[in-house]
Amino acid sequence: MVQLSELASALNQTESKGVFSKHPKGFGFVHPEDATDKTNDIYIGKNDTKFAMDGDKVTVKVTYPKTEKRGASGQITKINERAVVDTVGTYRSLSNRQVKALGYKGRIELYNDRISDTLYIKQPLSGVQEEDVVSLKITQYPTNTKTFEGKITGIIGHKGEVGLDILEVLCAMKIPQEFSSETLAEAEAFSEKLTDSDLQDREDYRNEITYTIDGDDSKDLDDAIHVKKLSNWHFELGVHIADVSHYVTEGSSLDEEAYSRATSVYVTDRVVPMLPVKLSNNLCSLNEAQERLTMSCLMEIDDKGKIVSYKISPSVIKTTYRMTYNNVNKMIHQGQEGHREALENFFKITDSIKVAVELHEILETMRKDRGMIEFDESEAKIILDEKGHPIEIVKRDRDTAERMIESFMLMANETVALDFQKKKLPSLYRVHDNPKEKSFAKLMEAAANAGFSLNSDSHQAINFFADEIKGTSSEKALTYQLRHTMSTAVYSEKNTKHFGLAATNYTHFTSPIRRYPDLIIHRLLHLYPSDHSNHTKDEWKERLPEIASHSSDMEHRAVVTERIIDAMKKAEYMSERIGEVYTGTITGLQKFGIFVALDNTVEGLIRVPNLHTGTTEELEFDEEASIFKGKKSETVYQIGQEIKIRVIAANKRKGTVDFEQIAPE
């Protein structure tokens, strides 16, 4: 007869397949294939990984099942598929003694410390020097009896070259740096002069006063606007977007490259474009006084922000002014320095800007009334010197001009999505799910503990809550938590709405120079008027899911890359400020410490031993409430709380900064 203990043991020894995420310290977690969230992840101890690396697909034997108090743990029994076959790192030569003892000429300090500590090289590539950054192909994975080996396939850069640190990250993240000769040849073959054939069947807006509004340094100008009042006192908003699809045709080398990249990547010292510069900064960029092919969305909007009518069509424009956010803000704000000069310099659009601001305010009110959830966000720009060293972090809040352009682009994106939806034509949508259930439940509890009402994740409830906490001592903490309950927006062939915008229909139409989904939208806008047969619709229904999935993945890769480089440069900046004192805001808590963000947007960690409360009492971590509290006193650390810190360490390579708390007096 089978004993209950034996049965339980047998049930515990179940196998599961999934993806291994490795921590730099060696342990990790397997995310099962059929799991929907991280609560089902299986912990793998350092000695139970079977030398699996980050991202490997593995089979795991569950040795301890999940309980109410702790997650499951197990042992990796098989590596089914390797995630990494090539990588990048820094070359280090070995001493003669080491060469003789180990049989290798050099080792590689890998960029990704989640793969493995050290990779050995039998024969370095000709020309490789100490501390060069190199690309590698893995030739042997580590086991109990085998060493981790690789072969150098190329030199990315030599020690001391400006920008090499950023280039290493781009290569590690597999962000392509060069275009193929075929792709470049296709781009160069286009004439700079528009022909009669190019202009055929296009609306002519060359006599319309149109202008672009972008950052001071922007070169890929893919959107222009015109705004005016009509005789019935309604507004006419024209959003004119570079017609990239005219040049990047389906099946071309340009198209294949654009699909592969799916997005431009914007990092501290450079832009890695989706398209060759001949297109991104020239033929498709709506440069001042240049005739450019566009796709236009003209909207008639009433004084409540409602669209009365619209027209979407291929077009041609001639940009009147290349405006910057700074100059437009000077035109808008009477008391701002340079206001009078800006009005004089850009006199042709003075009336249009006034009307644009009026329309923007109407649209903002309309979106707030329907429930759009908006957070005040600041951007930080890291200023580098000529050697690529960070010398300043400039924080910039979004002013009227920035919000106005965003408002108009949102309007165009919604209108184009509505057009596809009304005509029941296959398309791509930008969708955003409701808040994450578990995170939102924690927020509701935190709100209740602070004496505020948040009883659902409806737009009305969230906006009421946001207004209720405004100006209170809890605003920072609860707003930060609210922001982190939000899901990530993705691309989809299904129109499942956009929660954050409170929009029933939404797509990406306005940036085809830097986003592949927008290019697809333009392609479909060209296609459907002449061919909306069932065959064509069926073909696109089949193709769009893969385009959506790939575009979302590449967007995620770009975002992660940008964050890594941002963190690296901020750590480098703070490495010269060891010992300096700042006031920061607590942004997260874990049992090992507290994350703190400074006003300059640098984020660092105060480890528990460096939490100086001013007393000798011990702190305990309440995981459910996500707070640290004193065991005896009322000392509490929670998200949103201000805290005075001192910088004690910074690691550029890892992109980390360490703080210690300065004890309250």
UniProtKB/Swiss-Prot annotation:
GO terms for molecular function: exoribonuclease II activity; RNA binding. GO terms for cellular component: cytosol. It is found in: Cytoplasm. Residues 579-662 form the S1 motif domain. It comes from the Bacteria. SUPFAM superfamilies: Nucleic acid-binding proteins (SSF50249). This is Ribonuclease R 2. It comes from Lactococcus lactis subsp. lactis (strain IL1403) (Streptococcus lactis).
